[in-house]
Amino acid sequence: ARSSNLIEEPRRSKYLSYKLEGILDSSINVCVTYDPTKSGSFVIGRTSIPETGMFSVCCAVQNMWLAARTEGIGVGWVSILSNETLRNVLHIPDHVVPIAYLCLGHVNKFESKPDLEKSGWLPRLKLDDVIYHEEWLQDEPKIVR
């Protein structure tokens, strides 16, 4: 993976071990896309902020994720795939944007911590460290690796 070159060992090996695990083990894989040509050239909101179409797709993914969880179905968002690879394998037209590649499947239980947090990849940030009130502060959250 191209992005693995940016990571030093021993984290690189851990990163590469995540790559295909969910894709191969899940019951179903879903590629969620956004087609900016749908609904015509004028869509309220999208003319002033073009990204709102993609934001709406992300909200739909979140809603699907929450609905799946209530049914005992786990969802994993695979973010270490190349969009170009997805386009080629799934024959996605150039104007359509792959937004999410999801792995879904029944799970025995939901863990109390996300897998990446459990494995030490990244810690969970405190809510107070990522919410700003009234203005953007200069201090960025401290991420400990």
Model-derived features: where do they sit?
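Solvent-exposed alpha-helices and their adjacent loops that cap or buttress functional pockets
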Residues: 21-24, 92-94, 123
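Structural motif
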Residues: 27-29, 75, 97-101
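Small-aliphatic-rich amphipathic alpha-helix that forms the alpha element of a beta-alpha
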Residues: 30, 38-89
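Short secondary-structure boundary segments
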Residues: 34, 80, 106
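Short, conserved aromatic-histidine micro-motifs
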Residues: 84-104
